[in-house]
Amino acid sequence: MKKILVPCDFSDSAVQAFKFAAEIARGNNGEVILLNVVEIPVVHDSVMMPALTYEETYLKEMKDRADRDFAKMKSKWAKDGPKVTTQVQYGATTPTISRFVEENKISLVVMGTKGASGLKEFFVGSNTEKIVRWCPVPVISIKNATKASSIKNIVFPSTLHKDEEELTMKIKALQDFFKATLHILYINTPANFRTDVVNRKMLNEFAKRFMLKNFTLNVYNDLSEEAGVANFTKEIKGDMIAMATHGRKGLSHLMSGSIAEDVVNHIECPIWTWKTN
């Protein structure tokens, strides 16, 4: 997590993401890059206002405004470090951020979620959701003001499949960075019910295979995997959820927006996600 990208539209949620990212970077001598993407408006030529002149004026105004806002953020939230660089780029938000991640060898993206629906928006249709779907590096989604130093309990919903090796190693590194307890979680549902004897055996084998330390093993019964993750996290007062997205198995369909609104809106903690194949 040495090179952290924070896409920034200067909203409160973007500021919270920046503060979280800056704290991480201070802890490992890393760097934060603030990126503001300016959407280019479509303007037709006219006698009164040539398109090129309007576009140049608009882009200059947007860049000047972004530079001023960047300076305020750095002065207020990163006066004592870490290293913060800023970029203003032009184009459609998602492809521009995607290209930036690939070209600049970003290791982590930290994004704010926004809107009254909170994590509902994160899962359905927002820029955050779009970026989570394609991003080749981990993404941490921040809903509210959160101190990185407060992350002490990480919930890892797992299918316990053998093909989760790369994911699990990344989450172990995440746990090590935060010096947190890792709560391995298997959700037992009526549609895919397994006995406690079977589940406990699989959990113990999983922990042994990956040589886990400072962890708990948990089976949680609920009507759906989505509800189970949300309810378990609330019950143990989890500080972060870490999970895969967009895979063909397991919990990938968490991104489909099927979590009941009255459950997901009460999840306040950050979510770490990584796109698997």
Predicted regions: what they are:
Residues 1, 105-107, 128, 137, ...:
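Local beta-strand N-terminus motif with an aromatic residue
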Residues 1-53, 153-219, 234, 238-240, ...:
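Small/aliphatic-rich secondary-structure junction motif
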Residues 37, 114, 144-146, 187, ...:
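Short, ordered loop/turn segments at secondary-structure junctions
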Residues 42, 94-96, 118, 149, ...:
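Generic structural signal for helix capping and beta-alpha/helix-loop junctions
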Residues 53-68:
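A short acidic, glycine-rich active-site loop
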Residues 68, 72-109, 210-241, 247-255, ...:
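Structural beta-alpha unit
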Residues 111-130, 243-266:
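Glycine-rich, Arg-bearing micro-motifs that act as flexible, cationic patches
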Residues 111-113, 138-144, 271-275:
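Short beta-strand elements of ligand-binding domains
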